[in-house]
């Protein structure tokens, strides 16, 4: 379990007029006060319900006057506290129709990703559909279906008043992209069209007049900062009609960026799989890297790994600068990545200069996860079935079986028997004489290092020798020998 994921205090307060914020930093909860009772929007985590109740009392609201509990969507951080709040107050519960299985059956609630379990399943009193209205004591909340984050995500629009002025408040019910990445969608059987529905919802909501933009999460609209301004005397701090459209556009752009990142990542994985050869360059002076890479390119190499210096003699920044120069020089012709990556910050550095993949000597899940988060291909090192499985589950695209020379082709055959779904690269001691043996037992590719002989040829300007070597390896790997 992620330690106390529900904690994070935000001083409660009045948003404007009859609308209040009583939630926490991880989970926003708003309350609309009416003549006939309270409407609680997204009660949050069950673990934080006591805090929400205390916050309600702190702003002068009686939790026992809650008549309606309204959920923007069915995830644990929004609907987890519905059941205990309903049991306490007897309020009616409202959820988008598309999220019925989430709240009633505990399916895909995001509780598992937080390391906990969803025990608070409930059957909603009302299942809302697009265009429905939730009314109580003069309040009228328009509910618009905006699927994407979940199938049943609802966005809310309603008037708030201080008795003198009335403003239109609006909230998108779920803009997180954690459920719209390709892996999550594939693992959970979510159709890719959900992304298009998300974007369509964004466009639709641009047509809604919103003067008070409410955050479905605190950072969306700087809830905490605005509450502090209200507390300091600026009662109109939340009245920002200029914020709504830019926020929506930023979320649409974020999804398009995610799609582009995933497409680039998929292209990297495809090229590595097709080319089969990753040339590993270590200890070559920076000024010789481009001439060396050009010779490799002429020899048919399309994937090149530049290693960081584990001894620390050459600073990471210098090696990253070389990777950046190579990436720029060979854009569209050759993939450039980093090797001997042992820390997440090295992943960040590589990504910042245009590197396309990360090779590690070990199975560091922190490195793998950071690699995937940045849209790079992951090639960690492993030797045992347990290590290989750990790497694969963390998101590795290939697993580098290293050093393969210690084990031989028979070991690759044995490890692939139960793990045929993992793409193994044979690295360490691979020669022209034994490549066919590894290919015969299912090697997905190879890592081939630059040898002392290659460095000597480079120093002598004998690029033809380097080309010839590369051509021989590439030809054999692709079955053209």
Give the label of every model feature segment.
Residues 5-59, 63, 155-177:
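Conserved beta-strand hairpin/beta-sheet module of binuclear metal-dependent hydrolase folds
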Residues 277-281, 304-306, 336-339, 358-359, ...:
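Hydrophobic faces of well-ordered beta-strands that scaffold small-molecule active sites
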Residues 19, 47-50, 56-133, 233, ...:
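Active-site HxH/HxHxD metal-binding segment of metal-dependent hydrolases
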């Amino acid at each position: 379990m992620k330690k106390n994921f529900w904690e994070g205090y935000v001083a409660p307060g009045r948003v404007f007029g009859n609308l209040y914020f009583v939630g926490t930093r991880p989970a926003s909860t708003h309350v609309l006060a009416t003549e006939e009772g309270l409407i609680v929007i997204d009660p949050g985590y069950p673990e934080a319900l006591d805090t929400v109740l205390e916050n309600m009392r702190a702003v002068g609201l009686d939790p026992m006057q809650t008549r309606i509990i309204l959920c923007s969507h069915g995830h644990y951080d929004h609907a987890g506290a519905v059941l205990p709040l309903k049991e306490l107050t007897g309020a009616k519960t409202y959820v988008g129709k598309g999220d019925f299985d989430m709240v009633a059956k505990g399916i895909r609630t995001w509780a598992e990703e937080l390391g906990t379990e969803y025990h608070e399943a409930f059957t909603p009193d009302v299942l809302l559909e697009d265009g429905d209205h939730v009314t109580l004591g003069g309040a009228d909340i328009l509910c618009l279906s905006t699927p994407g984050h979940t199938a049943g995500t609802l966005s809310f629009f309603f008037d708030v008043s201080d008795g003198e002025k009335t403003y239109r408040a609006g909230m998108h019910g779920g803009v997180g992209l954690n459920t719209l990445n390709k892996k999550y969608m594939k693992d959970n059987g979510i159709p890719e069209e959900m992304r298009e529905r998300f974007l369509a919802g964004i466009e639709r909501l641009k047509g809604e007049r919103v003067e008070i933009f409410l955050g479905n999460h605190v950072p969306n609209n700087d809830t905490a900062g605005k509450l502090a301004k209200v507390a300091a005397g600026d009662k109109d701090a939340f009245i920002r009609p200029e914020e709504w459209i830019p926020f929506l556009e930023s979320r649409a752009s974020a999804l398009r960026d995610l799609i582009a990142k995933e497409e680039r990542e998929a292209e990297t994985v495809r090229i590595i799989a097709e080319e089969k050869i990753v040339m590993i360059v270590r200890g070559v002076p920076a000024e010789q890297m481009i001439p060396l890479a050009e010779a490799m390119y002429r020899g048919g190499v399309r994937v090149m790994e530049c290693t960081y210096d584990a001894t620390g003699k050459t600073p990471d920044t210098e090696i990253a600068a070389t990777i950046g120069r190579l990436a720029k020089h060979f854009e569209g012709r050759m993939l450039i990545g980093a090797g001997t990556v042992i820390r997440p910050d090295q992943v960040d550095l590589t990504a910042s200069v245009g590197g396309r993949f990360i090779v590690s000597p070990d199975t560091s899940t922190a490195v793998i996860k950071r690699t995937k988060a940045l849209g790079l291909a992951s090639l960690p090192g492993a030797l045992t079935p347990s290590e290989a499985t750990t790497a694969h589950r963390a998101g590795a695209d290939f697993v580098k079986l290293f050093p393969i020379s210690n084990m031989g082709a028979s070991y690759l055959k044995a490890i692939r028997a139960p793990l045929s779904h993992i793409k193994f690269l044979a690295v360490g001691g691979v020669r022209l004489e034994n490549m066919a043996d590894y290919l015969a037992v299912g090697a997905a590719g190879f890592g081939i290092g630059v040898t002392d002989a290659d460095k000597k040829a480079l120093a002598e300007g004998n690029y033809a020798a380097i080309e010839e070597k590369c051509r021989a390896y590439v030809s054999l790997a692709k079955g053209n020998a």
